Amino acid sequence: MKTITTTLLSLSLALSSLAQTPQASSPAPPSLDAVAGIYTTKPGAFISLAIFDPGDGENHLLFTDLTSGTIRVLAPGPGDIFAAGPALFVPSPIEMQLSFQRNGTKEATSLAIRKDKAAEETARRVACDRREITFKNGDVSLAGTLTMPADGKRHPGVVMLHGSGPLNRYSFGPFPDFFVSRGFAVLVYDKRGTGKSKGNLDASTLKDLVADGKAAVEFLSASENIEPGKIGLCGTSQGGFLAAAVAAENPSVAFIVNLYGMYVPVWQQELYRTEAELRAEQASDSEIAEALAFVTKEFEVGKTGAGWESLNATIQQSKEKKWWSHVTKSDSLDELRHYWDTLYSVDPSLPLQKVTCPVLALFGELDTSTPVADTIKNMREALSVAHNSNFTSHTFPKAGHGLLEVNSGASNEIPKSKRLAPELWETMDSWLQKTKSREQN
């Protein structure tokens, strides 16, 4: 994602030429907090403008149509203008402009959307109750945001669970807004050691992250704004399999939505990821075989503790290989053994054997991180141990990890993606409605 900042700068420069007056005399762009939120063009039709951290060290405004799946990172221009190009991170030519109407406190109340060869469309901002919150897991204080419809009613809740890496409350894209638009109260929080949360992410294990998720559920359960016994989990990637571990230890969890999370042993997932990424980037069979041999050897050393000297020699000889950036690696035997014990040896499907709530799992057929067929098979078998047949899975064609439309799944296609998988929002909405109906009957 190194090109994100450059492309956004290009879009901002292009926008400056659209100003009716010189940019220096234009009002400052609105803060992201003042314009971010959910907008509606007509009953049942919603647009998410989410504050989004794509990993480049800055927050951006992300436009998502919660019907069609159209998704764009927006760049600020002069005054109240934001705009986007023809694809997610492709800034030019400009194809969409957004301008805001604001109240006396500078909060956006509505927006006007202008697209090429289309009539201007107006969207009203949906009133939401957004609160900064903190909760604790032991000595670790975690900070986040709780958002719900501003109607004074109690709402079912959703706790969002992160994928791997130093992610924060702004890492989920449009998914929190989707749930809020459907009447849920949504808790997002900064992963320990990121944002405003305390703790040390590098020193944490999956067990720590599961405990953080449990603490989030307990915090939400104690809120007077939440319907008792109606808190679900939505996890992305690694968060998708952490959701099972959280629910296994908290039978009150009402449902799980697994967004492209893997349910195979982590070592197996890493082998799949290595091969799938290299094939998507058209590496040769010999390069793929060499990479898989390295990862297999690495895991054997991590498991047994024997053979580090030989592995380290291979590491030193392989740093210029084409496949090097696609494989896991450790700096010492102690580090490798730690990761084997706390990560690579973990089988996420085991906690699922204790889960009795409804489960929805959504994947892209071109996912280069999650082995989709094996994951679905393992999820179904694990849930059967708990006599849980309330399992629904769906695999979207031409979608990758993250459910963006792609051609091969290669990471360099992400900036050029134009939308999330068609029928994603309809699939989620339909399943949530059916789950709610079952609870009422």
What are these regions (language model features)?
Residues 154-163:
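Short beta-strand element of the alpha/beta-hydrolase
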Residues 257-354:
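Accessory cap/linker subdomain of secreted extracellular hydrolases
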Residues 179-196:
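Conserved alpha/beta-hydrolase
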Residues 20-136, 150:
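Peripheral terminal and inter-domain segments
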Residues 204-224:
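Alpha/beta-hydrolase active-site loop
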Residues 399-402, 408-441:
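Catalytic active-site module of serine/aspartate enzymes centered on a nucleophile-bearing elbow/loop
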Residues 355, 361-363:
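Short beta-strand/loop motif that positions the catalytic acidic residue
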Residues 165-177, 191:
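The serine-hydrolase catalytic nucleophile loop
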